[in-house]
Amino acid sequence: KDVKEQYGEILTKIGSMGFSAMMHGYMPFDEEDNLLVPFRTWRNNITEQATDVLTPLFGQQIPQRWSIAHLYQAILNGEDHVKDLAFFTTLAGYIHWRMTGEKVLGVGDASGMFPIDPKTKQYDAVMMDKFEDLIADRHFAWHLADILPEIRLAGESAGSLTAEGAKLLDPSGELEAGIPIAPPEGDAGTGMAATNSVKQRTGNVSAGTSVFAMVVLDKELTKYYP
């Protein structure tokens, strides 16, 4: 609509597109794709109890904003919705899912849901096992690996715009389905790409709702620092 009004052109096709949004937070869904609780954003710092357990358990800093912290806090709170979990994701992951039908996430955004193994570029399997052991006595029907989004790397296929997604973007129906869509990413990874700060020993600073630095290390940290 904006293109049509400003330039007099009807937009029907785009070479490719992608979605970026705030990282972290918690959007849980059941088997029928119903949102189980209102979106808990990265600013909902309500997970101190969870992070006090997860950080030493994983041997890695787990900030309160991370999705796994929100999930475990909901478990500690005894929240009824947890038993009905079928999938949880970030805001970018949700929008991408609505546009493509694919429950995937770019590796950068995924790293704010659960720690990533830099060798496999997948969720850290050892830490996932530790989490499963931690909640084993709760006897949930789900396993963590089954409810997290699948990870996609830059350049990998992450789906294409469906007819339903095209209608959401353009209610006029002029935008065509089939447009390839990149893996959804978070604001931090988007800033890294925008500033060409993706090589080892480079970094960038982002300033907006919060101020943070993204630094690409040349090796893993040997320990976490409280």
Q: What feature does the model see in each segment?
A:
Residues 2-226:
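Glycine-rich phosphate-binding/catalytic subdomain of phosphoryl-transfer
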